[in-house]
A protein has these predicted regions:
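N-terminal export leaders
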Residues: 5-13
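Hydrophobic core
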Residues: 13-21
């Protein structure tokens, strides 16, 4: 568990997109924004499923792309460190939220062993109007899928 927490922290520090939100205030997200945000996350998951490194990398913010340098390095990191995101057995999305200025998409994923994971994506709206993923936090849940 400690190793998982270290990996999670390391990934969060590398991507620079996560921070503690203990007293955060959630703001409403329009139906259009929610659909766009979920579509970006779903598209990246689809790219992971197809081992399409270039497409998966295209959904990351410029900051993430700069941190990893290239699509193959990014995909290798996700494949090795985040198998529940790389190849989830199931995905359920919650309604996105805007919390203290951060756009968050939470999801519950199960891995190939049936372990449940809470996944929080941080997204940014780019100047061109496109949503991009700026980080991802993964925390093990208590349950398992039967």
């Amino acid at each position: 568990m400690l190793q998982t927490r270290r990996r999670m922290l390391s990934f969060a520090l590398v991507v620079g997109g996560l921070w503690a939100l203990p007293s955060a205030q959630a703001a409403g997200v329009s139906a259009k924004q929610a659909a766009q945000i979920q579509a970006v996350v779903q598209a990246q998951l689809k790219a992971f499923a197809a081992d399409d490194a270039v497409r998966a990398f295209s959904f990351a913010t410029p900051r993430i792309r700069k941190a990893f340098g290239n699509a193959d390095t990014f995909l290798a990191m996700v494949r090795a460190s985040y198998p529940m995101v790389y190849r989830p057995s199931s995905v359920s999305f919650f309604k996105p939220e805007k919390v203290d200025g951060a756009w968050l998409q939470q999801a519950q994923m199960s891995d190939e062993q049936g372990v449940l994971w809470q996944v929080t994506y941080v997204l940014e709206l780019q100047r061109d109007g496109a949503w991009r993923i700026n980080g991802c936090e993964v925390v093990a849940s208590e349950g398992r899928v039967a």
